[in-house]
Amino acid sequence: MELPDPVRQRLSNLSLTMFGDSSRTGPESSEAADNEMVSSLPLQMSLYFNSYFFPLWWVSCIVMLHLKYSVLPDYYKFIVITVVILITLIEAIRLYLGCMGNLQEKVPELAGFWLLSLLLQLPLLLFLLLNEGLKNLPLEKAIHSIFTVFLTFQVISAFLTLKKMVNQLAARFHLQDFDQLSASSATGRRARQSSEEL
């Protein structure tokens, strides 16, 4: 299951714009850019542990919500249930995109993971952690804090990994462009030499 082409293209363009190294004018090396793995082991380990921590977080959240449900005002009941449902849906998509983007070195998937983490998941989780009106219990503060640490680490490491991936893809593109240019100039020289011989 892959991202639709228009979404992939827009995420690729966004990634190139945000994470590309505009100061570089050419590839750094010819051989290293082709074979270097730029997947992030710390990011993958964090995603792995997060996939085991998330069910624990979800069960704890539901149990704590059940315990304090009668004390919460009606509007907070609706908000908390909506936020927990959103976090659950986003987390499934986010973990999938993070694993696929990191392991297969796909920039659009990893950029989607980074954007979901930074723009949706982190603000929702900070709302649950820092809102005083929710009357957070100590267990909730602990699990939300751990989840926030996971997310913060993943946002930072995904940013650094995306930067490396985009720079490597740019180097590959420049190498291919250089190879095509040198091949076409060699063909042009051969054509000129054969026409001169005639």
From Swiss-Prot:
The residues that carry sugar chains are N13
What kind of membrane protein is this, topologically? Multi-pass membrane protein
What GO biological process, any one, is recorded here? non-motile cilium assembly
Which keywords does the record carry? Cell membrane, Cell projection, Cilium, Cilium biogenesis/degradation, Glycoprotein, Membrane, Transmembrane, Transmembrane helix
Residue spans crossing the bilayer:
47-67, 78-98, 110-130, 142-162
**Which domain of life does the UniProt lineage start with?**
Eukaryota
Q: Which GO terms describe its cellular component?
A: ciliary membrane; ciliary transition zone; membrane; MKS complex
Classify the main location.
Answer: membrane
Q: Does the keyword Cell membrane apply?
A: yes
Look up keyword Secreted and say if it applies: no
The cellular location(s) given in this protein's UniProt record come to: Cell projection, Cilium membrane
Report the PANTHER family cross-referenced here. Answer: GEO07735P1-RELATED-RELATED, TRANSMEMBRANE PROTEIN 17
Its function, per the record, reads: Transmembrane component of the tectonic-like complex, a complex localized at the transition zone of primary cilia and acting as a barrier that prevents diffusion of transmembrane proteins between the cilia and plasma membranes. Required for ciliogenesis and sonic hedgehog/SHH signaling.
Q: Which family does it belong to?
A: Belongs to the TMEM17 family.
What quaternary arrangement does the UniProt entry report?
Part of the tectonic-like complex (also named B9 complex).
Q: What is this protein called?
A: Transmembrane protein 17
